[in-house]
Amino acid sequence: NTQAFMDYGKVSRRWMMPAKYYTKVFDHKGTAIRVIFLDTTPLIDSYRKNQEIYPDACKQDAEAQLSWLDETLKNAKEDWVIVVGHHPIYAYTTKKENERLDMQKRLLPILHKYNNVAIYACGHIHNFQHIQKKGDNIDYVVNSSSSLARPVKPIDGTVFCSPADGFSVFTADKKQLRM
């Protein structure tokens, strides 16, 4: 229930999820980073078609979110732009390939359109992966979790992969975005 997560922000100062998709700019010592948070579930066809398991995805207008993303990226002037979604665009996984193909079909044209996205970060498959596709300026980062770790192996473009649990830390200045 996505609405429950948004409502929880009204009772806890430590939780902030103002909408199903939103953006936030972090500015520190003159370096600005725009983080764009997406709800990727409605971007996957099989989720939108399964009202019993994914009722939130069935009710959402995926095209409205994609239009919002396009407009947000068009106007993004920060030093760095990171897009965050739950589902991977590229990754080694035993999960259904159609999920990644749907993400590639819907997100990649927009992410590449303004040439300003540095990283697409996600989770969903419970391991670490850093993928750089040849000819693509975006780094694709899959984050693990602390509750479950799944096996992983390199795919085309893999820079790093590990089944360890944990999280990623990013630091930035005007010249470099480091992970």
Ranges and model annotations:
Residues 84-90, 120-128:
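Histidine-centered catalytic micro-motifs
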Residues 1-77, 97-98, 102, 106-119, ...:
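Extended active-site neighborhood of metal-dependent phosphoesterases/phosphodiesterases
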Residues 76-94:
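Short acidic, glycine-rich surface-loop motifs adjacent to enzyme active sites
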